Structures are given as C-alpha cells and as structure tokens.
C-alpha cells in the first residue's frame, strides 16, 4: 500500500506521458494549424482513467482510475474543449475523504472498510450518446448518464428500471438501422459467474428484449459484434482468479495459454438456448471491428494475436510473455448450417500490427470496405487505414515520441458513402508534453493531417470514444426524478 496519500507511484503507468492530469477545464477556440472543414459540426467524446488521488496500491493495473470525459465541440471551423470527471458514487466518496478509499482493480477485499458494499464503478472505458444522454460505460457496472452538452453527471442509468442485470458492457453497439443500443453484461449473476445477459434498448431508452446464456468458462467478455440477425460473442481465456485468488492478492484476470477460444452466435431477439458455439485453438482477441452475415455464414472481424496482449493480466504466477503480441485484423468465418464446431476459416486481412479497430459506424453489422486501427508495434505512434476491397493498407506515423490513441470516424453527412469523411485521433506530443488532435481525410491518411488542434494541457491517454453530429449534441431533458423525457 502507498505510504502517503499524496505520493504517486514511480511507474511507467503514472509518470511521463501517463502522469495524472486531473484538470477539469473549459477552453474555447483551441489553436488550429491547418483548416478544419466547415462541414464538421458535432462533438468528439472520449474518456480516460485519470485518478483523482494516488492509488492505495502502487502496482495496480493502469485503468483502475476515475473516468474523465473530454468533449471536443467542432463548429464553423472552430474547436472548443470541455473536460469533466464522471461524478460516480466512488468518486464522490473519495473526494469527500481527500484520499483513495477503493483498492485494487475489482478487488473489494482491498478497500477501506468505510466503503464496504459501495458501488465501485469508475465509468472510464467508453462514452456514447443514446436516448439523449451521454453514457459513460465500464463493463463491471451499470452506465452513468451525463448531459451531452455540459458533461454534468446525471446519475447511474438503468434504462428506466429495465436493465436486466447488474452490469453493462463498455462496448455496446448502436444498430444503424433500428437505433437500438445492443448491449450485454457478463458475470451477470455475480463475480466469476458464467452467466451473460444480452439485451436490446430501444431509441426510447427501455430494454425491449433480453436473453440469458452461459459462456463455456468465465472470461472477460469485453466486446461483441452485431449483424441484422445475430449478436456474436468471442470468449478468450482471460480467466478469473476467483474470490480466493483475490484474497491472496492475485489480479482479477489472468491469461490461460492452454484453453481453446469460443465464438458464440446468438439470434437477436432470440432465446439464450439458441446460441451456437464454435471453437478454435488458443489465441487472443479483445476489440472488434465489425461483423456481418452472408446467407448462413457469419463473418467476424477482430484484432487477433497468437498470445496474450494484456501485460497487466499475465498467466497467474508468471511474468508477462510478450512473444505473442503480433496483433492483426483477422476475419473469423463460421457456417451456421455446418455440423462442424470449428471455424470455417480464419483470414488475416492486413499485415499491419494494429489494435483499437474502428469502422464507419453507419456500417456496423453490414459488409464494409474501410477500417482504421491504432498501430500497436514499437512506440505505437501510427495510424493505419485498411481498404478491404483493394486489399491495401496505408499508414501515417507521428514522431516516435508521440503515441497516438484510438481513431474515430466522422461522416461528411449522414447519407455520404462509406468512408466519405474524416478520422479524428488524439496524440500526446512527447516534446511539448501537451495533447494534440489530428484530423485526416479518412481514405487518404498517408498525406498527413488536414488540421492539428493544439491543446494547452496534456490529457491522459483515453481508451475509447465516439462522434455525435450536432443534432444529437443537445441538453438532456430530465424530470425531477432524473428520468429522460421522451
């Protein structure tokens, strides 16, 4: 445990470019080098883990920090910045105490006794707008709602009392055809339970369907893919330590290099017992680009590496083995008419070493052409664009001292062709120690940024984010009970 509540760990996760920021700010008219296209009108939201106090344990995982949301509001060639902490129950308790009270990642046995039984949500993994509120998401908790304009925390969000389980994935998908939020929660009947609940939330903000099933073994069920008729779940062996393991000081998750992986295909609006499981040899995936169907075949595009990609969750009792970190965008194809439980094929789609995949969100669940990835080799200073029709990948790289973050696609208009728009991507300038925002023509990133937005502060590296056009960047309309007015 830390010796002082004012001492930050002397580790790579809390020093240099990763040092805490903790700045809640409003900065209008950020400096821009280049020209921001006038058509860009909306907000780029992102969220990072930014501890407000030094952690109780210096060697904890890096993402066990308070959610800090940043909004970049684009309008008329100008950009304004707003950053706010998500005011979770946990955040407010620690702010009142003036120190960290919660212990290791997902380990309640390491908490200060004063917070026993309190919600441990950090709301720090992803943000997106649905039903007129900005949802801050983390997979071990319900969402937290924020006002899309002010970033004021509105409170815990259970979809008007209809959330079917205690958790909600950070990687919910928005169906571009129906407007439904497609989500799930794992460990849905308690920590380390194999139970998963999939659910659909209508644009009116209520769960309209839910189905329960069990995964083959407990694992971190981090992401999913959707098609018009199916939801697809990868299960890879980032397995749980169990309660006794947590009490002994193990991390919540650890890698198992021997177990098979599984891919579950469940009919949307179906029953849990209709899920079909396919298996493949041991390998790793975390984040999903897209999924789509071709007759009775389902294609699932995800970033795959031969071994564990999470250095903070090594095999229990062993140091992290980096030998399997060559991660590439890969297509897994399964045939629902086949009696075979294996994958029909696995196809590497690019040789670019990349993760944090994003496509044009209007094409979620559909056949698609364009995808973008964060370079995941060396200093992680590159952006890749994959053209699946032409089978080519173009790359742009920042200086080696400037690590980049997850890309996000901005469509030129809601009815523009796929890929017609821009990519926005943040980076940390290792020379100035300030954050910058780069804007690229989406299908010509190799030419470099059209514009670079210069921040007067350094923000913590963010995990995920989303774009919302101006029509959705509106104040939340709530009644006295905090319920969204439809």
Question: How would you describe each model-predicted region?
Answer:
Residues 1-486:
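Beta-propeller domains
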